[in-house]
């Protein structure tokens, strides 16, 4: 394999932007579906490590049980009269914690928003768990016996009409799939792939409702619409696999073209650990001379259409991807540079996250999982200069085994226009949606960041990772960072406040979430809290200048990578659709698992400063608590 020469930025990848070029906290595309009125209500419960340790003394274990059997026993003992199935996405994380996920059923039909996740420690005992199982009255009769529900085609028509989807169903035919009561629709137009439907229950307002879960990928939205099984113009709830935001980037360490110049980099996979065993241009079966490999397929998409496989990519038999860029050029004049930049940024981030624990078993994005678990066949499709929009970006995350899809847009906020592919923060923010949606609730369930507060954390994680990666040697606790400033051509960035540990510069506390009804604003609060976490850990452990983390006893040795690792591990512990308090507890539990709780007080100091103190009680009204634990 020839050496790869990238005229990409070898420094730092920035972060993500909220989607609109003004400081209104909104990421809704003008042509998209507003799912806010259809979000599921929060129902998750989480038993953090301390409470779990006290509870499981009375729980019966067998030394012969594997971690899946132990987890199954816990669910059975907690809900002895309920039925459920084991989701086939269990794995043991790089921190030694086993993760097992369960889906509640009724009459053999999934209750789609009723989940139970169990995390098993190295000692074989339950470490933490969470659940949103339905505990109300079950339907007495099996709906499959009387078949007293609508035809799935009517459900598709109802979703299209109610949500005003750009899909034409006139000739739709429901073709049965192998899985019971699951159908693919043929004869439609307007969607990027054939719509699907599956008969499921959902819990809502204390009752179970039988619905058709209608799946439609229309580009700006990839929706799961829960259509009433009888009244098919009633849509109970909607989940969107697509997450939007606005950002810009240059290279690893450089946030955007204002921070440095393009740098020649040779064989970058040699410095990014074991995440890419086939290099960035092979998948174990094929070697490519274009910007495609096991992790990423990067190409332009000026039409904004669904096709990507045969779209234009830079091609170099010598793997010398060296192209010109100037701020005086229009984006279409440097598309080779932009595609190469996007390919470099996403592959580097893939490898960094791999080292931190986003592996094949955890549901990462790869064509060939090389026998290491997970589903495979799901590398990320990354479109540069996508013509389906401007001044934004998005990432669609279906379950493990289906391709993630990133669409990066140009920005018309300056003359000449600017290309979001050159602001690493935007790229990192978007790819982080793939990370969080695969880890929260398990790789097979991409519905676990749909509720408003949980969805806000999905946005906040994107900002957090983009900002953490952007930090530079010489930065201190007093260093502030904005979001999307270059791409949006907006001094101060696109968020309400810059990320800062100074309460005068950024006064956000958890109580501010009370008045918010949009995920990007909530995400800014969550990322503000995590910025405090980041700097407390850097103050304790320092900050490495290396791209990849170094580990001591399984934990990153520097504060930046430790913060990124604990936040990632926390995602794997928390329940489906968590709230801020549950996410806080999961991060503290992640530290307990990784370092035996050495950083508990540094973490709680950060959370307490912003209102999530030791005595905070989650309720309808969010009231700050600034208390530290007694043992700190």
From Swiss-Prot:
Binding site for Zn(2+): 429, 433
Triggers of expression: Expression is strongly increased during growth on protein-rich medium containing keratin.
Keywords linked to the UniProt accession: Glycoprotein, Hydrolase, Metal-binding, Metalloprotease, Protease, Secreted, Signal, Virulence, Zinc, Zymogen
Predominant cellular place of this UniProt entry's protein: secreted
GO molecular function terms attached to this record: metalloendopeptidase activity; zinc ion binding
PROSITE patterns on file: ZINC_PROTEASE
Pfam families noted in UniProt: FTP (PF07504), Peptidase_M36 (PF02128)
GO cellular component: extracellular region
Keyword Glycoprotein annotated: yes
Enzyme Commission designation: 3.4.24.-
Top-rank EC class of the record's enzyme: hydrolase
Propeptide segments, given as residue ranges: 20-244
Record's signal peptide: 1-19
InterPro entries: FTP_domain, Fungal_virulence_M36, Peptidase_M36, Peptidase_M4/M1_CTD_sf
Listed Gene3D superfamilies: 3.10.170.10, Neutral Protease Domain 2
Cofactor: Zn(2+)
Intracellular or extracellular location(s): Secreted
Cofactor note: Binds 1 zinc ion per subunit.
Gene Ontology process terms (BP): proteolysis
Protein function: Secreted metalloproteinase probably acting as a virulence factor.
Protein family (similarity comment): Belongs to the peptidase M36 family.
Name listed for the protein in its UniProt record: Extracellular metalloproteinase 2
The species this protein was found in: Trichophyton rubrum (Athlete's foot fungus)
Gene: MEP2
